[in-house]
A protein has these predicted regions:
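Family-specific signature for flavin-dependent thymidylate synthase
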Residues: 1-226
């Protein structure tokens, strides 16, 4: 198993048996049209792989896939789950599982709101505000969990008691994605406009994917072909 920790308690891992095929599968799938295949990776394969990606002939990249195990805050997973094409998701459900002393997310640093871009933060809050923001967040988590526990104790069903839970709680999910979907995720979520918290996970995904599909993931590093 390969595993990369993200933040204090999050992680991304590939379980044993979670990798399906390799770079050679991609180019050999493309060669089916000519009834040809390669047995070993060579320069012709690298050129073909680059041609396929550069010209958006992406169907061969959908024949390979990876299954990831993920532990991340719910708000990160909700962004991540917008990636649906070529993907399959399963996540812990707090309808079936009661939350016991939840693990919660704290930012390393709080950012200020960008005055022009409504969807992103920019810069870092002053130190005094960092401390206060952390205290406010911690208090919010405590209030939410006490409310959840009170609802459970009075007999409210789990599927309704969970309504009060914050999106900063960590959850676990399994994500199986085609190589094309993985590369698309990396390309989008490593962009500087992406939220830092999901960008940290995209770094981990890229690092793990590159172990098993080095030639394909290299296509995302355009400077390597200059």
């Amino acid at each position: 198993m390969h595993k990369i920790h993200v933040g204090l308690t999050g992680y991304v891992s590939i379980p044993d048996g979670g990798v399906f095929d390799d770079d050679l599968t991609v180019v050999n799938t493309a060669r089916v049209s000519y009834n040809k295949k390669s047995d070993e990776w060579g320069d012709k394969d690298e050129r073909l792989l680059k041609y396929l990606w550069d010209h958006e002939h992406t169907s061969p990249f959908r024949h390979a896939s990876i299954r990831f195990e993920i532990k991340a805050p719910i708000f990160v997973l909700r962004q991540w789950m917008k990636h649906q094409i070529g993907c399959s998701w399963n996540e812990i459900s707090y309808r079936y599982t009661q939350v016991e002393e939840p693990e919660v997310f704290y930012p390393g640093l709080f950012r200020s709101q960008d005055a022009k871009n409504k969807q992103s933060g920019t810069g870092i809050l002053p130190l005094a505000d960092q401390t206060k923001a952390t205290e406010i967040l911690h208090g919010g988590y405590e209030i939410a969990y006490r409310a959840y526990q009170a609802l459970i104790d009075m007999g409210v069903c789990r599927e309704q008691a969970r309504i009060v839970l914050p999106v900063g709680i960590y959850s676990k999910a399994e994500w199986t994605a085609s190589l094309q979907a993985i590369m698309h995720f990396i390309d989008l979520r490593l962009d500087e406009s992406a939220q830092k918290e999901i960008r940290d996970y995209a770094v981990a995904i890229k690092t793990l994917a590159q172990i098993h599909f080095p030639q394909s993931i290299k296509l995302l590093n355009k400077e390597e072909f200059i």
